[in-house]
């Protein structure tokens, strides 16, 4: 997959010209430019690991369950699946969240074949897909979302998004008036 480093060069958008071919790298570049713009807005409001909903930590002896929810990581609010982890229950243990990325082809997902029945590309392969999922681990490399001490929840890291703080300030000012 080809992608030029447009962000470093301060390129803002791509201009398609009549009579010229679009390159596959240019489709990837368009997506990257848009994702970077969205991420810059998201990063000004949220921190990686901010829980939007759910993602509660439930401890039952040496098993930790993190409920399904939504969490901001790497520029996107992501759906998370319920996850069960085994802990030692001794000392300090961190529950971390990270993104696991895989490339999906039409071999793994037949719905990626062209569905335009009757066309020359009918049931032909098209673009691969990049799949990103949130993976929880004990003492992993990701963002710390909870800290356990001797098997008990010591700190569930839920920092309020900047918009929540702004809303609270506005509510106090409105109430005071």
Question: What are these regions, as identified by a protein language model?
Answer:
Residues 1-16, 21, 26, 60-177:
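Beta-strand-rich solenoidal segments
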Residues 9, 14-53:
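N-terminal "first-domain core" detector
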Residues 40-59, 110-120:
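Short linear, low-complexity motifs centered on an aromatic residue
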